[in-house]
């Protein structure tokens, strides 16, 4: 993966000038590593070979699964959904109950064969209202159709020791995977939260974690080679711009921008240590689709954005565009490939946004592979953690969501 800042003049000088600030931010972050409550366990997930073996054993023991239902919300669903959509090679059908709307829930229940369905309830705390509600609905369905065999069709992913979901799993003798204590939900994509669904999707888990290890390596590298420090500085230098657009040029990665939005917004939209409100608003975008939706605004709307484009440099396979008689208007496409068109559109949009005066940079992926995407996702986690230090906020809590939970309970109890 490489960073391109060709349209941001002066960035190399800014990197040198802000070197001490970045080094201090990294030092402060790493000084917390290993401390109880630091929530930095995501750094160690790429090295967790025991969990990888456990996930694989479970997958091998359950070859009958044709439909995989993940019940979870927020970080419990966004990471798995992004990765599974990109790398599902198994034919297993995936369904995400990351909502509490009754109509689509009932539609899903009516289409599934319970004998061939595995339900995975995911919640770090084990008390997430949406997850428990969905679990209760599916539990009733499983018991009604399968009797005492329902336990074979339910697996949970939750805290190692605590919470209602862990207690329920132990009481019922269910298989339960542990989300490490020091790993928060939005940083959990490379824990069993993501690895278990990906095992059923047939994805290359070794390559995914190898890419994440590459991100760890670059995060700890000298400043000139530390990609996460560089991109964190880009966001820091543009923190006066309220909008951060994350635009990915890959249909397979269509769910990745939503994962990034949660990672960025929930980690960094905070009251800082001086009592000031800080943060920028991440906006998801997908190329080339959003060239026909949002790019008009990006080009001629307010110059209030920092845009990051994620562009693959090569395809894993390609399709030639054939010549078609009567479509001479498309002759410039004939003989080219779909990826050549995708790459040309991405590069053209990159240049057009810069020409319009928007602040824009690109991250070029070698290809959309488990290795490259593991690198990218772990890189973005490091970027977020470094920004937490630069912006003087705790990037690993979310106090702003608690009142909504309290008021929801109050309304239901009343």
Curated annotation (Swiss-Prot):
GO terms for molecular function: carbohydrate derivative binding; glucose-6-phosphate isomerase activity; monosaccharide binding. SUPFAM superfamilies: SIS domain. GO terms for cellular component: cytosol. It is found in: Cytoplasm. Its main location: cytoplasm. The keyword Membrane does not apply. Keywords: Cytoplasm, Gluconeogenesis, Glycolysis, Isomerase. The active site is at 266 (proton donor), 292, 405. It catalyses: alpha-D-glucose 6-phosphate = beta-D-fructose 6-phosphate. One of its GO terms (biological process) is glucose 6-phosphate metabolic process. Its EC number is 5.3.1.9. Pathway: Carbohydrate biosynthesis; gluconeogenesis; Carbohydrate degradation; glycolysis; D-glyceraldehyde 3-phosphate and glycerone phosphate from D-glucose: step 2/4. CDD domains: SIS_PGI_1, SIS_PGI_2. Transmembrane segments: none annotated. InterPro entries: G6P_Isomerase, Phosphoglucose_isomerase_CS, SIS_dom_sf, SIS_PGI_1, SIS_PGI_2. It comes from the Bacteria. Belongs to the GPI family. Catalyzes the reversible isomerization of glucose-6-phosphate to fructose-6-phosphate. This is Glucose-6-phosphate isomerase.
